[in-house]
């Protein structure tokens, strides 16, 4: 069974993989990093005008990294907005995914946090730098193979 967006993407011969539906009936799609930006633009034009959230996670130690986007199609006069979840998997070594900042401005801090915690580089993001950790921090704290330092000196702001 396909959701509306998946059926539309198939009709227009756009590469993706349906991962089924979650417990709330929200369809989840897998998109390749190289196809993500064009499908993001198409999704926006199709009506997914709101990026509800973006997050990232480490799939497994030494495995892929995933960037997850929850998109919502909000229309005037429609009681129940349509939602879709899109997962973009990137290799652990040099993970690069196109930024959707220029489509949905709400991706700004969310993509920066994913970069800061997992090291996913969001290409063409205007301010991709650490947001939670100090600039001098080495490594990506939410990766499953991350080894925390025994000591880290916190510098006073004064």
From Swiss-Prot:
InterPro entries: NADH_DH_suC (IPR010218), NADH_quin_OxRdtase_su_C/D-like (IPR037232), NADH_UbQ_OxRdtase_30kDa_su (IPR001268), NADH_UbQ_OxRdtase_CS (IPR020396)
Pfam assignment, any one: Complex1_30kDa
Record-listed E.C. numbers: 7.1.1.-
Keyword annotations from UniProtKB, A to Z: Chloroplast, Membrane, NAD, NADP, Plastid, Plastoquinone, Quinone, Thylakoid, Translocase, Transport
UniProt main location, coarse: plastid
PROSITE patterns in the cross-refs: COMPLEX1_30K (PS00542)
One GO CC term, this protein: chloroplast thylakoid membrane
Family recorded in the similarity comment: Belongs to the complex I 30 kDa subunit family.
Record has NAD as a keyword: yes
Oligomer and partners: NDH is composed of at least 16 different subunits, 5 of which are encoded in the nucleus.
GO molecular function: NADH dehydrogenase (ubiquinone) activity; quinone binding
Gene: ndhJ
Subcellular location: Plastid, Chloroplast thylakoid membrane
Protein name as it appears in the record: NAD(P)H-quinone oxidoreductase subunit J, chloroplastic
């Amino acid at each position: 069974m396909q959701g509306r967006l998946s059926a539309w993407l198939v009709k227009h011969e756009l590469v993706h993989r349906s991962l089924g539906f979650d417990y709330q009936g929200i369809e989840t799609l897998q998109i390749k990093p190289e196809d993500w930006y064009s499908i993001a633009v198409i999704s926006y034009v199709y009506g997914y005008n709101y990026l509800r959230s973006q997050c990232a996670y480490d799939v497994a130690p030494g495995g892929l990294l995933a960037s997850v986007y929850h998109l919502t199609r909000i229309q005037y006069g429609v009681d129940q907005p349509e939602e879709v979840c899109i997962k973009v998997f990137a290799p652990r070594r040099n993970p690069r995914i196109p930024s959707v900042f220029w489509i949905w401005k709400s991706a700004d801090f969310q993509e920066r946090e994913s970069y800061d915690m997992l090291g996913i580089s969001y290409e063409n993001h205007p301010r991709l730098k650490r947001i939670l950790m100090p600039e001098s921090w080495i490594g990506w704290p939410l990766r499953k193979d991350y080894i925390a330092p025994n000591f880290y000196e916190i510098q006073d702001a004064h």
